[in-house]
């Protein structure tokens, strides 16, 4: 993972006073133009600096067609950050601290999401085990869920969110830095943090799909936001085909003759009830 220690722990980092901050900020900026880069998701795994994760969310919101998957500070310190043993690097009171820190940021965006805690994965090439930020598992689950069903199906639960060997992340997830109780899961979910839970029979499972939108609405769910991103992209492509054409009934009919079948297809595949 990225060595976050090269970034100071204050919130005063800028492109001009920290080379690492500038490097990552520039990398994020390379995908800010939707006409230049096609994507539907953005993440910088392992980077927990609040200014940079906010930049990820801002880029996704400004584009209006991507979901940002961010990591949060205080969950776990990898060996690149701390030479102490594993138990010391896992902060005993981290859950409450992470929840409090996220609430203090006053985020309210349906274009972002976050997960807890870190996961242990097995390198498929070397067989070695390593700890990875939760965004890594989440991204894999999004991809496998979309491949197995549709982008508007929730990438969570035992069917589409199972992370244990052969599971949804696309690579074996063998452990977590912290096993969550039912009360822990409730605390995280109320703070719009998606828990990665461990169950005796089912193993390790992503057990939530909230966005970082605090305002209650359908868009506080990941699958709804991804549905809207999908529809917006497809409708935009249809609309581009009639750009600058005459504003007459024949043009409107050309648009609806393509848009209606698209929406009907989404409805048939359980993405919409009506349109």
Model-derived features: positions:
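Structured, hydrophobic secondary-structure cores that serve as assembly/anchoring elements
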Residues: 1-275
